[in-house]
């Protein structure tokens, strides 16, 4: 606090200006005007002066005060009120108050405990006017505590009482002065402590000595003191707490012994301490609960101030099972919080991600960039052949089976401009790869074969392009074939809301032939025209930012990621963060296989130097240093693990019943290795979709790279099928597989994997049986046989009745028995079967209650061929 005037200081302290001036002068400071400035040193001098005067006032106060009181009363002594005699009794009371500082303290300073006190036997002379004998009854001696200081005798003179009265008046005046000074000191200490802290040694808190208050509230203070509620300033020695009427009967009187120990006082004090002053809320308390992406049940209950058992009950009522330490996801947490009547607040723990965005240097130089074009369409409609013609290479011949199974990223320089092409797979298994291609592109070229028309993958490609809000250019391929019908293609595409410009729409249609090269130049012109309309621009300086198109594990080079740079410039030696992985860029390889030092916007390059294989579709950014990259990567890995665990543990009651029955279902374990990450995801997804309620496909391990010894060990331990897609096993893995009789299946086309796994699952299906009724016989009469029992004489009214087949006995179309046909005879001969229209005798095994009119239904069980 800065220097203030005397007037301002008086207002802060809360006393009149004249009084503050007097106190300043008493402290030795020359102040006469209220506009004079008081600095910090003068405030300290005034504070020390007031503390000293307070201490003197306290020391001047008497250390012990004795209070005496007399009271007169009349008591009737006798058998009744009329014949009894009245006795005048004088009762004297004496109470002594001793200052606490005069008694040695035995407890801690912070919370002093009342020292034990002993009351010496005191004799009171009582004048009794009656005819009763003048004997003084004996009073029992009270020894409540060990002796500390004897109490003065009560046979003192009236002068001492007057002296006490004068002491009381003096104490009252001193108390008023002390109280006033104390208030001033407290206010002044607050002012001084704003800038200069006062040490504990300098702090002196004067005790308030007020005799009048003690004398007025004696009874309440003593009762509170006994209960342990209050520690009085003075020790009270009370000789006659309860009025004891003493008659002069001779002898000496002693006080009654008061039973009460120090231990019981402590218990009373503890009970008083444990009682709280809070009232039970009458209205429900609605709390704002912060919910992160994952949270345990115990932590969620703590944030709602309820027990974890209550949260578990609510989750069970909602159909979800959980334990107190289980991690639940954000969606489940929000439902639980709302169900319990609180307000959920969703928070995103992305402080690290936000810091990453701030740390990335952003460029300012903007230039035009080449368009990124994705070629989409159905299988074998000529996507890669078109790109092959444009690049003048043989890409299609290099793909297994002639179909594309990777995302190919190529940068093509044409006489009219540069274009970056992304070639996506066309078959259904690569939906995720195709979706990633649409998200990273500017223009989509939809290839449709003129002789085949619109197919399911064609429709799916249209949906991806519309979802990404990317313009479409339709290329009608295979126009060199004689059965080409472009009008049919246009009609089918118009159904999918792709209207050609010739029909008044906004989609360009180009007729081409990837084999002969017809219309290729027109297609390139359409692409460049569309890019000019889009006005594609990107920042060329600053940190690079892009997307991972594909990734793989290359033998000798390690993890390799194909990155399409979208903004900035990627240099060799930069620290690149891609999803969960990071690393220093050791080399940049162009799509032609050349080593380059940098890559600008719309340029695809292969990056070497990452710590592991990133996921296709992950965002790749250049960060300032490796420390920041490691921090963000570890944060993402931890968050991904928590979210995955929460989703895995989200078990419903229905799921528990499924798991109970799932033990009976058969599982086909698979260890899968592929050459690139995108193919691995597509194969794993396609195989998982083959699962049914009876048989399941479990990809227990999947990875990018060759088959190693650890993969073979895992397949042996889990009894799994080992599949390699465009990869081979090393020598150690081959030898181990031969020793353990583990077969390794190699594939280069995804359809072959799906077909073989589907066949294996079909063989694992449990056989299904169907009952077929082969014949029905009507009972006409019943005969008794001593060997078999009841024999039913029947007429075969439908089909054929065969011996040893299972049968059912029907009475009024109700099945009353199911068993086996034991005996079948025609006349007296045993026969194997009886056809429709013939009579026969039928003996039912272990059943004799056959009556005329019953129907005997003969059936057999037939196995049905199962299929997925």
UniProtKB/Swiss-Prot annotation:
The keyword Transmembrane does not apply. Residues 513-515 are annotated as: G5. Residues 156-177, 199-269 are annotated as: Disordered. One of its GO terms (molecular function) is translation initiation factor activity. Residues 249-260 have a biased composition (Basic residues). Keywords: Cytoplasm, GTP-binding, Initiation factor, Nucleotide-binding, Protein biosynthesis. One of its GO terms (cellular component) is cytosol. Residues 156-166, 199-209 have a biased composition (Basic and acidic residues). Its main location: cytoplasm. Residues 402-406 are annotated as: G2. It comes from the Bacteria. Residues 368-537 form the tr-type G domain. CDD domains: IF2_eIF5B (cd01887), IF2_mtIF2_II (cd03702), mtIF2_IVc (cd03692). Residues 477-480 are annotated as: G4. GTP binds at residues 377-384, 423-427, 477-480. The keyword Zinc does not apply. It is found in: Cytoplasm. Residues 377-384 are annotated as: G1. Coiled coil: none annotated. One of the essential components for the initiation of protein synthesis. Protects formylmethionyl-tRNA from spontaneous hydrolysis and promotes its binding to the 30S ribosomal subunits. Also involved in the hydrolysis of GTP during the formation of the 70S ribosomal complex. This is Translation initiation factor IF-2.
């Amino acid at each position: 606090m800065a220097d203030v005037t005397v007037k301002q200081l008086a207002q802060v302290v809360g006393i009149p200006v004249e009084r503050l001036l007097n106190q300043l002068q008493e402290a030795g400071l020359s102040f006469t005007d209220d506009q004079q400035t008081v600095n910090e040193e003068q405030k300290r001098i005034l504070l020390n002066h007031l503390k000293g005067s307070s201490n003197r006032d306290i020391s001047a106060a008497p250390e012990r005060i004795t209070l005496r009181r007399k009271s007169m009363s009349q008591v009737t002594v006798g058998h009744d009120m009329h014949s009894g005699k009245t006795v005048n009794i004088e009762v004297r009371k004496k109470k002594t108050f001793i200052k606490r500082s005069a008694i040695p303290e035995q407890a801690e300073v912070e919370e002093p405990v009342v020292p034990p006190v002993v009351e010496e036997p005191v004799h009171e002379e009582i004048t009794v006017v009656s005819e009763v004998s003048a004997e003084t009854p004996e009073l029992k001696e009270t020894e409540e505590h060990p002796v500390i200081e004897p109490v003065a005798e009560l046979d003192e003179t009236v002068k001492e009482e007057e002296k006490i009265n004068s002491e009381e008046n003096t104490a009252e005046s001193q108390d008023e002065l002390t109280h006033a000074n104390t208030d001033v000191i407290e206010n002044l200490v607050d002012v001084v402590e704003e800038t200069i802290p006062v040490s504990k040694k300098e702090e002196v808190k004067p005790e308030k000595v007020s005799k009048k208050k003690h004398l007025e509230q004696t009874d309440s203070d003593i009762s509170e003191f006994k209960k342990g509620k209050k520690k009085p300033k003075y020790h009270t020695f009370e000789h006659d707490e309860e009025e004891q009427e003493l008659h002069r009967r001779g002898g000496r009187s002693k006080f009654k012994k008061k039973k009460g120990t120090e231990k019981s006082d402590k218990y009373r004090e503890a009970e008083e301490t444990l009682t709280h002053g809070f009232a039970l809320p009458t209205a429900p308390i609605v709390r704002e609960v912060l919910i992160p992406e994952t949270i345990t049940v115990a932590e969620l209950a703590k944030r709602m101030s309820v027990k974890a058992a209550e949260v578990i009950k609510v989750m069970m009522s909602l159909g979800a099972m959980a334990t107190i330490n289980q991690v639940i996801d954000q969606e489940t947490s929000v439902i639980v919080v709302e169900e319990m009547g609180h307000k959920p607040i969703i928070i995103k723990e992305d402080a690290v991600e936000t810091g990453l965005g701030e740390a990335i240097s952003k460029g300012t130089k903007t230039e035009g960039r080449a368009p990124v074009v994705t070629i989409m369409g159905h299988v074998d409609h000529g996507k890669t052949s078109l790109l092959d013609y444009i690049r003048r290479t043989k890409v299609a011949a290099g793909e297994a089976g002639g179909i594309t199974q990777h995302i190919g990223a190529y940068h093509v320089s044409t006489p009219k401009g540069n274009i970056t092409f992304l070639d996506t797979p066309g078959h259904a298994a690569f939906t995720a790869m195709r979706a990633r291609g649409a998200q990273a592109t500017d223009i989509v070229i939809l290839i449709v074969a003129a002789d085949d028309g619109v197919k399911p993958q064609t429709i799916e490609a249209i949906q991806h392009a519309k979802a990404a809000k990317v313009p479409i250019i339709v290329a009608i391929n295979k126009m060199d074939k004689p059965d080409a019908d472009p009008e049919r293609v246009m009609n089918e595409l118009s159904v999918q809301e792709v209207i050609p410009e010739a029909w008044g729409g906004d989609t360009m249609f180009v007729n081409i032939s990837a084999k002969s090269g017809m219309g290729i130049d027109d297609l390139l012109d359409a692409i460049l025209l569309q890019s000019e309309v889009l006005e594609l621009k990107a920042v060329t300086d600053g940190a690079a930012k892009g997307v991972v198109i594909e990734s793989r594990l290359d033998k000798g080079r390690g993890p390799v990621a194909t990155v399409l740079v979208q903004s900035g410039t990627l240099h060799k030696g930069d620290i690149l963060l891609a999803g969960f992985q990071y690393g220093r860029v050791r080399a940049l390889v162009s799509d032609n296989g050349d080593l380059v030092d940098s890559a600008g916007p719309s340029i695809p390059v292969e990056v070497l130097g990452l710590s592991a294989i990133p996921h296709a579709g992950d965002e790749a950014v250049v960060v300032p240093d490796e420390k920041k990259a490691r921090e963000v990567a570890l944060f993402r890995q931890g968050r991904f693990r928590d979210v995955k665990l929460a989703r895995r543990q989200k078990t419903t009651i229905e799921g528990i019943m499924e798991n109970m029955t799932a033990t009976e279902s058969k599982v086909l374990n698979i260890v899968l290795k592929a050459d690139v990450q995108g193919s691995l995801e597509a194969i794993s997804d396609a195989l998982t979709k083959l699962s049914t309620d009876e048989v399941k496909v479990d990809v227990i391990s999947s990875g990018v790279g060759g088959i190693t010894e650890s993969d073979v060990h895992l397949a042996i331990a889990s009894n799994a099928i080992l599949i390699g897609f465009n990869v081979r096993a090393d020598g150690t893995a081959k030898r181990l597989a031969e020793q353990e009789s583990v077969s390794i299946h190699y594939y280069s086309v995804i359809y072959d994997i799906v077909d073989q796994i589907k066949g294996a699952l079909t063989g694992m299906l449990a056989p299904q049986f169907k009952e077929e009724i082969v014949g029905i016989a009507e009972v006409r009469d019943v005969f008794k046989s001593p060997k078999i029992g009841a024999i039913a004489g029947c007429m075969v009214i439908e089909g054929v009745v065969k011996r040893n087949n299972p049968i059912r006995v029907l009475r009024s179309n109700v099945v009353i028995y199911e068993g086996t046909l034991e005996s079948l005879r025609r006349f007296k001969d045993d026969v194997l079967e009886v056809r429709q229209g013939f009579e026969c005798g039928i003996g039912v095994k272990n059943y004799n209650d056959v009556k005329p009119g019953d129907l005997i239904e003969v059936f057999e069980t037939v196995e049905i061929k199962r299929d997925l």
